[in-house]
Amino acid sequence: MGRSPCCEKEHMNKGAWTKEEDERLVSYIKSHGEGCWRSLPRAAGLLRCGKSCRLRWINYLRPDLKRGNFTHDEDELIIKLHSLLGNKWSLIAARLPGRTDNEIKNYWNTHIKRKLLSKGIDPATHRGINEAKISDLKKTKDQIVKDVSFVTKFEETDKSGDQKQNKYIRNGLVCKEERVVVEEKIGPDLNLELRISPPWQNQREISTCTASRFYMENDMECSSETVKCQTENSSSISYSSIDISSSNVGYDFLGLKTRILDFRSLEMK
């Protein structure tokens, strides 16, 4: 449930205040004090809203209000207070006797802000504009380095389970190691000789190759590793490996180095 309105809006005067209304308001407050602004208009014989009476008194009719332009000392004090308090105009006005928060806010937006910008000072941070940009850039860079430092090695497996990726941190950069498993089933050669011999035993040879390579992720090249192959049959298991650090190096359309590995060049033992 919201707050009830301060007065009925029907049969209320709106717009500029007349001299007679100002005199009634000043006379009543001098005699009875400010009191409750809700009941004050009716007691003073004014067809005005309580909020309108309060703003009229605070901003225009108070006897301690200062008239005229802001002085140089007031300008310096407003700038100093704004650097400490920000846009809290009521707190700033409390430290400038005779000035209202609305008056100070309008003066800030129309005069002081332009004055600071002409001197190359950011009105929001009260620092040099170039200095603020450099500081923001440094914060962004520090945040990126901080995010990278928290990266740990983890392993990702795709849906088929044949491809795995490991991430490492090398010299502050993220490198990815990709492992591709290639499995090849090799059956026996077809024997076309017709002769009587014992039944052929169903032997199957399986070759599995795992290629590990590092590729670039942060505009720097990461080192490559080796390819390991394993050949299995019913009688024995053999292993072979090849170094791909000297494999073909190419460039993609972005100018990034890529390494090409031809699995056909591997010799299965």
UniProtKB/Swiss-Prot annotation:
Its main location: nucleus. GO terms for biological process: regulation of flavonol biosynthetic process. One of its GO terms (cellular component) is nucleus. Induction: Induced by abscisic acid (ABA) and osmotic stress. Induced by salt stress. InterPro entries: Homeodomain-like_sf (IPR009057), Myb_dom (IPR017930), Myb_TF_plants (IPR015495), SANT/Myb (IPR001005). SMART domains: SANT. Disruption phenotype: No visible phenotype under normal growth conditions. Increased levels of flavonols. Decreased levels of anthocyanins. It holds the Pfam family Myb_DNA-binding. Coiled coil: none annotated. Residues 37-61, 89-112 bind DNA. Keywords: DNA-binding, Nucleus, Repeat, Repressor, Transcription, Transcription regulation. Residues 9-61, 62-116 form the HTH myb-type domain. It is found in: Nucleus. One of its GO terms (molecular function) is transcription cis-regulatory region binding. Expressed in anthers. Expressed in pollen grains and mature seeds. Expressed in roots and vasculature of leaves. Transcription factor involved in the negative regulation of flavonol biosynthesis. Represses the early phenylpropanoid genes, phenylalanine ammonia-lyase (PAL), cinnamate 4-hydroxylase (C4H) and 4-coumarate-CoA ligase (4CL), as well as the flavonoid-specific genes, flavonoid 3'-hydroxylase (F3'H) and dihydroflavonol 4-reductase (DFR). Plays a role in seed germination inhibition. Negatively regulates the expression of the abscisic acid (ABA) signaling transcription factor ABI5 in seeds. Interacts with SAD2. This is Transcription factor MYB7. It comes from Arabidopsis thaliana. The gene is MYB7.
